[in-house]
Amino acid sequence: MFAQPFDHAFNDLFSQYVDMDSSMVDGNKDVSIPSDFDQIFSLDSLSSDCGDHSPPVPTKPTHQSPQPWATDLWSLPQDAASSASQCSFTFQDTVHPSAVSDLSFHLEAPPTSHPVPAVTCKASSRSPSTPPATPHHKSTKSALVTPKSIRRHRDSHERKLLRKQSFSPSLMRPSQLQAGRMMYPEAWAQRFQNFSLHSSGEHLPLSPPPSDILVQHENTPADNVVTHMNHSTEGLSRNPAEMPSHYETGIFNQSPAISMPSPSAKLLAQQQQHNYLSQSNNSTMATSSPPSGDDIFSSPHSSDPQSLSSWHSDSLGGSALPFTPELQAHDGQAWWPSMPSRVPRQPSYQHVVSSPAPQRSIQSNNQHDLMQGGLMIQFDSSFDGSTSADPSFSSVVTSAPMPQENQNMYSHIPVTPQKYMNLSAYATPPVQHTSRSPSLSPRGRGSPTQGSPLRNEASTKTSPHRRGYHGRKLSSQSMNTPKPVKGPNSSSPGSGSNKSLTVSFVNFTPNDSKKILTGVAPSGSSKTKARREQEARDRRRKLSEAAINAVRKAGGDVEALEAVLC
């Protein structure tokens, strides 16, 4: 992809782009390149319409009435168009710095000037068949093409903001839009068709000359350099004749006629694209790593005003993807070997997914079999299968802190769906074990301290968790334990008929109660009743004894009294 060797002959030309200041620009206002464009575009009308810029030829500042650009263009003589077709505006290797730096007049101070032939050659060559309102639009676009503007605004975010600001309708006067309506689009396309063919290979370069100085002094990483060139080529190497169709509803809705793009404009855009690709491939030779796949196929940002044109123009042709001519020839070789450079940048995802040691080999073998089976084509020999999992799957694994057994379960999700079913069935007992563990702990503590098993079971009945799990177990223990059963005559003190019977089970049918049961266990109410009856008998006995003693002391008949009391 970067097969061309780097040439150090551009360093002197690059130093001329870099080493210039505003004093040199201001001191060379009278520098102008003479050509045949002086006959096409008059200097006074251009200086009065393009903004607050002084004319390049030092004249006295006379106030002239602003005239629309279209009136100057349509009043051209026929020999001016013929001389424009024979124009040869070549870019020498030793161009004066002010002639190049003055092109960025929207980013410099207002008193700076711009040479008329350079600007008009850029505007007319890039828009041969567009409305006259578009040359304002294209002249502002050429300011962003200049090397100084790219050198000053290396941040991609600031460059997108400047590009968005330069295309806003507030910078264009509505009176000029009203006055600049195109009346004869066929005549415009016919006049400048020959000129665009002559000057297509001789325009100013879209970027500063490729130099290793820029790569050495660049502090941004390699991915930002690639995205820097992608955004610059996305906005600059596009077909310039397609611009009115993208902005016709918002900005240029006042122009009545939109002309179709001519074949010369498409040829011009392709030549510009190939020239820029050759320069950008040379300038990125000294970078540390090749551009990765997601940087090459970068999606357009929503803040970019040309995002619509990159996806809706000519079914994603060469103008939308700047690195397409290299990638179509070497698809697999350019896409997959760049992936291992992206893999070590995500060590946290890799270690979390592959953290369980016994399951690491299974996961890597399954992923090698899966991805070499036809889903993914080419891999490097040092490319590990466990690290090739997509970061979206890894972010699902690392999204929430989870225990070790759950982590073992989720680490097999990107491999096969059968692993997920087996491990989900495997992971259900530990979940139940963790829910049962708080209820099992009081039983282990209470067994040595509490003496009788009945009191232990009564204490565990109070726990809400144990009632559901151990209700059947407690009922079987209560029926199997031997209990003392009192006979029916247990209320009488002197009966002596207390027996201990072992009852194995209880059946509530009347016939079985006659055959099996010999007594009923005393309940709480029967115990209270027996105690009260015993107290009443003791009270009557004490009273009778006291009465007998009193009668005996008095000398009465004791036998007759005992017969009455007993």
Swiss-Prot record:
Induction remarks: Highly expressed during conidiation. Expression is positively regulated by hsp90. Expression is also controlled by upstream regulators calA and crzA. Expression is decreased by 2',4'-Dihydroxychalcone (2',4'-DHC).
Single Gene Ontology BP term?
A: regulation of transcription by RNA polymerase II
UniProt keywords (A-Z) are: Activator, Conidiation, Sporulation, Transcription, Transcription regulation
Q: List, as start-end ranges, the regions of compositional bias called Basic residues.
A: 463-473
Sequence ranges of Polar residues compositional bias: 165-174, 269-291, 347-364, 381-398, 449-462, 501-511
The effect of disrupting this gene, in the record's words, is: Causes the formation of defective spore walls and a lack of trehalose biogenesis, leading to a rapid loss of spore viability and reduced tolerance to various stresses. Also leads to delayed germtube formation and reduced hyphal branching.
Residue spans making up a coiled coil are none
Q: Which domain of life is it from?
A: Eukaryota
Region entry Disordered, spans: 116-174, 232-316, 334-364, 381-400, 429-542
Entry's InterPro entries? WetA
Q: Where is the composition biased (Low complexity)?
A: 298-316, 435-448, 482-500
Function recorded in the entry:
BrlA, abaA and wetA are pivotal regulators of conidiophore development and conidium maturation. They act individually and together to regulate their own expression and that of numerous other sporulation-specific genes. Plays an essential role in the completion of conidial maturation and is essential for trehalose biogenesis in conidia. Negatively regulates expression of the melanin biosynthetic gene cluster. Also plays an a role in the early phase of fungal growth including proper hyphal branching.
- According to its UniProt record, which protein family does this protein belong to? Belongs to the wetA family.
Name of the protein described by the UniProt record: Developmental regulatory protein wetA
Q: Which organism is it from?
A: Aspergillus fumigatus (strain ATCC MYA-4609 / CBS 101355 / FGSC A1100 / Af293) (Neosartorya fumigata)
The organism that produces this protein has a lineage beginning with: Eukaryota, Fungi, Dikarya, Ascomycota, Pezizomycotina
